[in-house]
Amino acid sequence: MSTVHEILCKLSLEGDHSTPPSAYGSVKAYTNFDAERDALNIETAIKTKGVDEVTIVNIVTNRDNAQRQDIVFSYQRRTKKELASALKSALSGHLETVILGLLKTPAQYDASELKASMKGLGTDEDSLIEIICSRTNQELQEINRVYKEMYKTDLEKDIISDTSGDFRKLMVALAKGRRAEDGSVIDYELIDQDAQDLYDAGVKRKGTDVPKWISIMTERSVPHLQKVFDRYKSYSPYDMLESIRKEVKGDLENAFLNLVQRIQNKPLYFADQLYDSMKGKGTRDKVLIRIMVSRSEVDMLKIRSEFKRKYGKSLYYYIQQDTKGDYQKALLYLCGGDD
């Protein structure tokens, strides 16, 4: 079974320099995987009186994404029905959201979250910002392709019709996924020049030359920008984040802050987002679910360690305190353990 799957994977990845599943993911491929058996067990769980949610959660959260795609295929072949719609009828609430999210490929998931953030009245800017600011070039290019496939329109077109001004310019530039890749050569002259340009375009003058900020922050590689933000402190009395707070407001401020934090330390950025989703009264489940689903195979172990370091208690502990039932169980499986 796996060999056929491996061949299919290789074929679909040709010309796509895909990184191997991350060593820092909390969800790994299940060793004794059998798509047919999983599909059958899910089918039985759905038909059980009152729905056997535990079995569904156990299977879906303990398989990696490629394996879930095999289960979707096997289920369809077995029952002539789509697994997603069967589970949609069987489950409800936040648990349904988690499980349906896990059945999509990463790009389908991001594309559907982006579409949802721009649908109907008003835009959910926070979701738009989080996804667009935190994905790699390769991820963004795949999202653009899948978005067009799913919605018969370009992601860029939807962003343009849903946003305005400099915020729109920043989102459009980021969504292209054309940031320079990490070079092996460190260009100290350019680092210094960029740091000075960011200062000259903002804190140093009256008003802000936002296009200058956008071009540097969306075109340069991440390691380069990390050094630029360090160098920036030798020109400006404020660090980059403080400068943003002083210079711009609203969605644009929010977007630049997210972008800089994610450039400085991506796992810490997600740890902060997770903490914010659970602190105080009530839970921002949409954010919690999206990060747990989308980072579980990427960098969840790094996120967990940043979370514990900064907030003193584990992410696992926070999820336990903040959620309940099978929804909680699903999130804890994705978290992958206590620290």
Swiss-Prot record:
Ranges of the Annexin repeats in the UniProt entry: 33-104, 105-176, 189-261, 265-336
SMART domains hit by this protein: ANX
GO biological process, any: positive regulation of receptor-mediated endocytosis involved in cholesterol transport
Residues recorded with modification Phosphotyrosine: Y24, Y199
Major location (coarse): secreted
Swiss-Prot/TrEMBL keywords: Acetylation, Annexin, Basement membrane, Calcium, Calcium/phospholipid-binding, Extracellular matrix, Phosphoprotein, Repeat, Secreted
Modified sites of kind N-acetylserine: S2
One cellular-component annotation, GO: cytoplasm
Keyword NADP found: no
S100A10-binding site: region residues: 2-24
Residues carrying N6-acetyllysine: K49, K152, K227
Domain topic, free-text comment: A pair of annexin repeats may form one binding site for calcium and phospholipid.
Family as reported in the entry's similarity comment: Belongs to the annexin family.
Physiological role: Calcium-regulated membrane-binding protein whose affinity for calcium is greatly enhanced by anionic phospholipids. It binds two calcium ions with high affinity. May be involved in heat-stress response.
Cross-referenced PANTHER family: ANNEXIN, ANNEXIN A2-RELATED
The protein, known as: Putative annexin A2-like protein
Gene: ANXA2P2
